[in-house]
Amino acid sequence: MASSSGPISPTSLEMFKPGVEELNPSKLLLLSNHQEGMLYPTILGSLELLSFKRERSLSLQKDKVCLLHQESQLLKLRGTGTDTTDVLLKQPMATSVNCCHDGIFTIWEQDRMLKTSTAPILTESTGSLATRLMSIPRLTLSIGTQVAMRLFRLGFRLARYSLRVTILKAQEGLLLIPDLLRAHPAEPLVQDRAVEPILAIEPPPLV
């Protein structure tokens, strides 16, 4: 049994409520200590502290495993006559991302992440964006033209009326393009090839 200065034994818990088996687990929890074989009374709230300590110890143990992994690879290289001076500098930065996933990066890793994130933006600004803008209307117009020709051959009056309304709305939008270009200037490539051919299109007759 435990002394008065040590941890509380199960028999001394009777002062809280008669019958240890009938204790409410939401008010009083008993955690087993495997080292001393005693029971410690723990109230709700201290469990979060214990879980925080457990997670912190696991993270420290994970860091130790990473360090041992790096040292073992260096020992393999040392016996082959390879110069490990450069490996000592590059290996911690290369394996830090694989071992530690807690959001801590080195300066070299942050620089590499910024370069990879800005790479698509640089390629878009060098001319591929204008090429993509030109390919999208061509594909859309080719599909729309095929559908319109099929509908006109079938002679559906309602379908032809819907197409006529769509074309009239498109022409109305073309009339507003000069005002939009003054507010938001576009590239000359998009202005010359996308606006002028559409102005020559006439709406199909409604039969």
From Swiss-Prot:
- Presence of the UniProt keyword RNA-binding in the record: no
| Chief location | virion
Q: Does the keyword ATP-binding apply?
A: no
Q: Where in the cell is it found?
A: Virion
Matching InterPro entries, A to Z? Corona_nucI, N2-like_embe-CoV
- What Gene Ontology cellular component terms go with this record? virion component
| Short name of any one Pfam family annotated for the protein | Corona_I
Q: Which UniProt keywords apply?
A: Virion
Outcome recorded upon mutating residue 204 to L: In strain: Isolate ATCC VR-759 and Isolate clinical OC43-Paris
Query: Any extra remark in the record?
Result: The gene encoding this protein is included within the N gene (alternative ORF).
Tell me, what does this protein do in biology?
A: Structural protein that is not essential for the viral replication either in tissue culture or in its natural host.
**Record family assignment:** Belongs to the coronavirus I protein family.
What is the official name of this protein in its record?
Protein I
Q: Which organism is it from?
A: Human coronavirus OC43 (HCoV-OC43)
